[in-house]
């Protein structure tokens, strides 16, 4: 039997329903792959093998009877931000040591109701704060992609018997992999690595400023951040409540559409979830885009953008034009203010949300001589450096002397960013095409990034506007850089028009193809 982990969700779904394979077989294949690869990649922080086998067995029983949901028997990885009843849920933070919730997040409950199988919990940046998956208490996730290089190899002169001439030697070039470890992006780095390295069929993720789309672009996978309110946030550990949104990371556009259909729902437990029908996103794939108006924002041509990113963008424009779309130049004038405004709003909300972690009822507790010292010691030991930095920023901008100067101004900028998009869509633009990231994946422990947090924050330059405006955005693989690393393009849509994103992303995918890392782990 061929490697079952190589099947896409749509392929596995067909084989499961056709009784060509069983849920138990494909689940065991993934558990074996995780066992072999996770020591090298660190994608999973908890593997739920026994639960996965029980869920697969139950799926097989339903499939035998011709029953089963939309994801029956499909093995998935779950980002450690999603509450999973009785299972490790720590947001990859020391402060939540040993926490196993008594509840199930709405998104994961939807997946289990549709028959999905849980393989385990995936690594991530601590409390989803990061763009490289290096802030996790459990250590960095390793990108399964590596840079490749051309080596010149000297060929020996060889002879055969009695001086018979075979080869005159000389040189030849061959491509080989660099050993340098790369980041998978963040905060959903474990999700992206697990999908890219065939350690799950698909994964849940969350996106507050680009945490689905940037890792997807860095790993050659597809990631969609749906419209704010499309998926329930109930049971998901909060970072910035007005920006957080759950979505899937998958191997191709169709798989992402299948997953989002199951993840999305209205939820009375989340007042920000929106009560509107969830469409059949998969049905949008393959529809022509002839006559669709695609906007190209001039403000996304940033200083110092690498040539390969601009070239990729132009290639994407050509693909959509060739498919019959009308390309129009647009302006989103407040784009340049999005990143500084985001890094005021998000930390402000985080400082409020993270105030609840005090060591009293659950998680880490470091004793002190009184309750105040216990709070101080617990939070000092429990939170990592980046989380502390953002709590301090948030507390500062919310303080009495600076609230008007920073937080209030940032919220005004947010409204202007939202209005920019509204004006463009009102003018008839159907979808906006931009790069997903300003570069390909960079190295683990990059000295420039470590020395200047702002450089790390700039990884979100193309993605934060989408969160600030509450819009849907999808990252789709579109090519490789000169060193063989994946690059992605981003599509931004009107509110609740994820179908248009899937429809357009499928055109890019068909033109660009799909990308898989060369296995080294």
From Swiss-Prot:
Catalytic reaction list: L-glutamyl-tRNA(Gln) + L-glutamine + ATP + H2O = L-glutaminyl-tRNA(Gln) + L-glutamate + ADP + phosphate + H(+)
Superkingdom of source: Bacteria
Molecular-function GO terms, alphabetical: ATP binding; glutaminyl-tRNA synthase (glutamine-hydrolyzing) activity
InterPro entries the UniProt entry points to: Amidase, Amidase_CS, Amidase_dom, AS_sf, GatA
Keywords: ATP-binding, Ligase, Nucleotide-binding, Protein biosynthesis
Keyword Nucleotide-binding: yes
GO biological process: translation
The protein's Enzyme Commission number: 6.3.5.7
GO CC entries: glutamyl-tRNA(Gln) amidotransferase complex
Pfam families per UniProt: Amidase
Key word Ribonucleoprotein present: no
Active site per the UniProt annotation: 79 (charge relay system), 187 (charge relay system), 211 (acyl-ester intermediate)
Cleaved signal peptide residues: none
Family, as annotated: Belongs to the amidase family. GatA subfamily.
PANTHER family given in the database record: GLUTAMYL-TRNA(GLN) AMIDOTRANSFERASE SUBUNIT A (PTHR11895:SF151), TRANSAMIDASE (PTHR11895)
Subunit structure, as described in the record: Heterotrimer of A, B and C subunits.
Function in brief: Allows the formation of correctly charged Gln-tRNA(Gln) through the transamidation of misacylated Glu-tRNA(Gln) in organisms which lack glutaminyl-tRNA synthetase. The reaction takes place in the presence of glutamine and ATP through an activated gamma-phospho-Glu-tRNA(Gln).
Full protein name: Glutamyl-tRNA(Gln) amidotransferase subunit A
Species, as recorded: Mesorhizobium japonicum (strain LMG 29417 / CECT 9101 / MAFF 303099)
Source taxonomy: Bacteria, Pseudomonadati, Pseudomonadota, Alphaproteobacteria, Hyphomicrobiales
Gene coding for it: gatA
């Amino acid at each position: 039997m061929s490697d079952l982990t190589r099947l896409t969700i749509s392929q596995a779904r067909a084989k499961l329903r056709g009784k060509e394979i069983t849920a138990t077989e494909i689940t065991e294949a993934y558990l074996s792959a995780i066992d072999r690869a996770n020591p090298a990649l660190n994608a999973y922080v908890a593997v739920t093998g026994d639960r996965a086998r029980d869920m697969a067995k139950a799926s097989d029983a339903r499939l035998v009877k011709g029953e089963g949901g939309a994801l029956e028997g499909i093995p998935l990885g779950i980002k450690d931000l999603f509450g999973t009843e009785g299972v490790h849920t720590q947001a990859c933070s020391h402060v939540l040591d040993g926490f196993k919730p008594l509840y199930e997040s709405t998104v994961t409950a939807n997946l289990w109701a549709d028959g999905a199988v849980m393989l385990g919990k995936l690594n991530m940046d601590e409390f989803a704060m990061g763009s490289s998956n290096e802030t996790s208490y459990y250590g960095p996730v390793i990108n399964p992609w590596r840079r490749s290089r051309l080596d010149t190899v000297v060929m020996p002169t060889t002879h055969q018997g009695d001086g018979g001439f075979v080869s005159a030697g000389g040189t030849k070039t061959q491509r080989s992999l660099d050993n340098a470890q790369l980041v998978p992006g963040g905060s959903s780095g474990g999700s992206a690595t697990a999908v890219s390295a065939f350690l799950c069929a698909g994964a849940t993720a969350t996106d507050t400023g680009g945490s689905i789309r940037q890792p997807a672009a860095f790993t050659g996978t597809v990631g969609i951040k749906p419209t704010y309110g499309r998926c329930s946030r109930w049971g998901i550990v909060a970072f910035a409540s007005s920006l957080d949104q759950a979505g899937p990371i998958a191997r191709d556009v169709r798989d992402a559409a299948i997953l989002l259909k199951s993840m999305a729902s209205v939820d009375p437990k989340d007042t920000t979830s929106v009560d509107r029908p969830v469409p059949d996103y998969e049905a949008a794939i393959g529809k022509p885009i002839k006559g669709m108006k695609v906007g190209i924002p001039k403000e996304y041509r940033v200083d110092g953008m690498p040539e390969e990113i601009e070239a990729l963008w132009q290639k994407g424009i050509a693909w959509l034009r060739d498919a019959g779309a009308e390309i129009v130049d647009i302006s989103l004038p407040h784009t340049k203010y999005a990143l500084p405004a985001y890094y005021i709003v998000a930390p402000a909300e985080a400082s409020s949300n993270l105030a609840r972690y005090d060591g009293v009822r659950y998680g880490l507790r470091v004793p002190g001589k009184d309750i105040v010292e216990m709070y101080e010691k617990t939070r000092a030991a429990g939170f990592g450096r980046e989380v502390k930095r953002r709590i301090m920023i948030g507390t500062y901008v919310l303080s009495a002397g600076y609230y008007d100067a920073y937080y209030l101004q940032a919220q005004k900028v947010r409204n202007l960013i939202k209005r920019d998009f509204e004006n463009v869509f009102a003018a008839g633009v159907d979808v906006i095409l931009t790069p997903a990231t300003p570069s390909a994946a960079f190295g683990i422990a990059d000295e420039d990034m470590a020395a200047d947090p702002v450089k790390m924050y700039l990884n979100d330059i193309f993605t934060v506007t989408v969160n600030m405006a509450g819009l849907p955005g999808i990252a789709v693989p579109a090519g490789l850089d000169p060193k063989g690393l994946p690059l992605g393009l981003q599509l931004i849509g009107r509110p609740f028009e994820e179908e248009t994103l899937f429809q357009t992303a499928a055109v890019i995918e068909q033109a660009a193809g799909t990308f898989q890392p060369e296995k080294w782990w």
